[in-house]
Amino acid sequence: MALGLEDKKAIVAEVSEAAKGALSAVAADSRGVTVAKMTALRQSAREAGVYMRVVRNTLLTRAVEGSDFECMKDVFVGPTLIAFSNEHPGAAARLFKEFAKGNDKFSIKGGAFQGEFIPAAQIDRLATLPTYEEAIAKLMATMKEASAGKLVRTLAALRDKKEAEAA
């Protein structure tokens, strides 16, 4: 079905609006994936706060012009499924990576984060970013370990000092 000019403008506006508020983006090729699996992927994307859409490459190129995702233009070849992470930078990459494990025909083309292009082979960099809660938990664990270690060292120094005074 051919799209009219107004439809194309609406698609470009919708995708560029999604790109403006996004933290990261990932592009993939979903040729050969069944409709049922794609529906499940779309549902998972909604739950994860990821905007996902299949868009014509020319329209997608126009939509990302002037955004942090302009560096992805070279991967917009063939059918392109684009996903923008709105809540967490690694959400779309994690979602696509998990989906690709169970679907041989699904292939990740690449991603972008803060204006930097991430090739498909390195998408794990983006997928393994900790969530805000995970990062805070790691920080707190590190702080607790550091303070416990400091306490142990202080107590050991105090013990050594008392032993030196007693001798």
UniProtKB/Swiss-Prot annotation:
Question: What UniProt keywords apply to this chain's record, in alphabetical order?
Answer: Ribonucleoprotein, Ribosomal protein, RNA-binding, rRNA-binding
Presence of the UniProt keyword Ribonucleoprotein in the record: yes
The answer, when asked if tRNA-binding is one of the entry's keywords, is no
Molecular function per GO: large ribosomal subunit rRNA binding; structural constituent of ribosome
Q: Which GO terms describe its cellular component?
A: large ribosomal subunit
Q: Which GO terms describe its biological process?
A: translation
Subunit-level organization: Part of the ribosomal stalk of the 50S ribosomal subunit. The N-terminus interacts with L11 and the large rRNA to form the base of the stalk. The C-terminus forms an elongated spine to which L12 dimers bind in a sequential fashion forming a multimeric L10(L12)X complex.
Which family would the database say this protein is a member of? Answer: Belongs to the universal ribosomal protein uL10 family.
Q: What does this protein do?
A: Forms part of the ribosomal stalk, playing a central role in the interaction of the ribosome with GTP-bound translation factors.
Q: Could you identify this protein by its name?
A: Large ribosomal subunit protein uL10
